[in-house]
UniProtKB/Swiss-Prot annotation:
<keyword id="KW-0699">rRNA-binding</keyword>
<dbReference type="InterPro" id="IPR029751">
    <property type="entry name" value="Ribosomal_L25_dom"/>
</dbReference>
<comment type="function">
    <text>This is one of the proteins that binds to the 5S RNA in the ribosome where it forms part of the central protuberance.</text>
</comment>
<dbReference type="InterPro" id="IPR037121">
    <property type="entry name" value="Ribosomal_bL25_C"/>
</dbReference>
<dbReference type="Pfam" id="PF14693">
    <property type="entry name" value="Ribosomal_TL5_C"/>
</dbReference>
<dbReference type="GO" id="GO:0003735">
    <property type="term" value="F:structural constituent of ribosome"/>
</dbReference>
<dbReference type="GO" id="GO:0008097">
    <property type="term" value="F:5S rRNA binding"/>
</dbReference>
<dbReference type="InterPro" id="IPR011035">
    <property type="entry name" value="Ribosomal_bL25/Gln-tRNA_synth"/>
</dbReference>
<dbReference type="InterPro" id="IPR001021">
    <property type="entry name" value="Ribosomal_bL25_long"/>
</dbReference>
<dbReference type="Pfam" id="PF01386">
    <property type="entry name" value="Ribosomal_L25p"/>
</dbReference>
<comment type="subunit">
    <text>Part of the 50S ribosomal subunit; part of the 5S rRNA/L5/L18/L25 subcomplex. Contacts the 5S rRNA. Binds to the 5S rRNA independently of L5 and L18.</text>
</comment>
<dbReference type="InterPro" id="IPR020056">
    <property type="entry name" value="Rbsml_bL25/Gln-tRNA_synth_N"/>
</dbReference>
<dbReference type="GO" id="GO:0006412">
    <property type="term" value="P:translation"/>
</dbReference>
<comment type="similarity">
    <text>Belongs to the bacterial ribosomal protein bL25 family. CTC subfamily.</text>
</comment>
<protein>
    <recommendedName>
        <fullName>Large ribosomal subunit protein bL25</fullName>
    </recommendedName>
</protein>
<dbReference type="GO" id="GO:0022625">
    <property type="term" value="C:cytosolic large ribosomal subunit"/>
</dbReference>
<feature type="region of interest" description="Disordered">
    <location>
        <begin position="185"/>
        <end position="211"/>
    </location>
</feature>
Length: 211
């Protein structure tokens, strides 16, 4: 289990104006949803969060310290401003240690497929798996090596090896990656308009019917 630390402050100010002031002060407004579903308004330091954000995935457990108490959470959602390229708001969800959870984990393909060197094209299927396990057993990401994949071969969910403590809920026959040849283009060139006219002129006229 990959785990990181992030400090947070509980906040008592709400609304758009308060959020704008907070961001100007270098803080990001956020909400933590605890294990009982209760929402706790918090804010985090922008620089500290962005350093963390570059190192984690959606399945990384973060230790969130707020008001002197530690919470084990996921970064479940965030709002991104495409103009300023900054994070505007974050949603954290608490997980309960020792209790099974269900979540989706990203798949990352690695390696240069054998089939691509033979003229094939790598086609990707699903990009994440739904898993069930204890928080301590949850992988941050799923690495799949496609180096040995040759032309007309596929890799499915059932081919991915995970620890015994992790249960895969995604159907095992779904394709993760495949190597296929590009569709062959027709080698017969289409006749141009001029060629069609010349062909029509050269064709013999039908014999006149007897009256």
């Amino acid at each position: 289990m990959e785990q990181r630390l992030l400090n947070a402050n509980e906040r008592s100010t709400y609304g758009k104006n308060a959020a704008v002031k907070m961001r100007k002060a270098g803080r990001i407004p956020a909400v933590m949803y605890d294990r009982h579903g209760k929402s706790v308004p918090i804010d985090v330091d922008e620089r500290e969060f962005m350093k963390l954000f570059k190192l984690v995935t959606e399945s990384t457990i973060v230790t969130l310290n707020a008001a002197g108490k530690d919470y084990e959470v996921f970064i479940k959602d965030f709002q991104h401003d495409i103009v300023s390229d900054k994070i505007k708001h974050i949603d954290f969800y608490e997980v309960e240690r020792g209790k099974t959870l269900r979540t989706k984990v990203k798949i990352r393909l690695e390696g240069s497929p054998e089939g691509v060197r033979h003229g094939g094209i790598l086609e990707t299927g699903i990009t994440e798996l739904e898993l069930e396990c204890l928080p301590k057993d949850l992988p941050a990401r799923i690495i799949v090596d496609v180096s040995a994949l040759d032309v007309n071969q596929s890799l499915h969910v059932r081919d991915i090896k995970l620890p015994e403590a992790v249960t895969v809920l995604t159907s095992d026959d779904i394709t993760v990656a495949a190597i296929k040849f590009a569709a062959a283009e027709s080698t017969t060139p289409a006749a141009t308009e001029g060629e069609e006219t010349e062909a029509a002129a050269a064709a013999p006229e039908p014999a006149a019917e007897d009256k």
